[in-house]
Amino acid sequence: MQEVFGRLFQCKVMRPKYGNHKIKNAYGTYDSQLEFARFLFLSNREKEGEITNLRRQVEYLLIPAQYGTEIKHLKTKDKGVRMLLERSCSYIADFVYERNGETIVEDCKGSKYIITADFKIKKKLMLWVHQIQVKIISSPTFWEK
């Protein structure tokens, strides 16, 4: 079906960039099957009382927005106007929870080989700015029991 569509309209049917498929269900929207499976695993751990305060898609500010002042020349006077020079940079963690009083931040990746340069920088900034080390989850077979 996709090949026929592509030939009829002379376009390429796009696949997900890293081969993941979004999951939408009663629990919410997840970027991959791995992320949804990890959510089920962690929510069971929370019900058993092993972890607490499980949260999804938590945003951490890494670099605040940068503002500057530009002088506007009006007919009667000059006026300084605040303008945005650079947008803020933030990291959105897949999962954040607490175990034994320690905050744990996790990010699900399909493979340890599909880690982008942006993620590497944001992971280092998380450690530097918030003193939190991001744990990479790549395969269900390596999850702790």
Segment roles from a protein language model:
Residues M1-K145:
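Electrostatic, structured charged patches in enzyme active sites and in nucleic-acid/phosphate-binding
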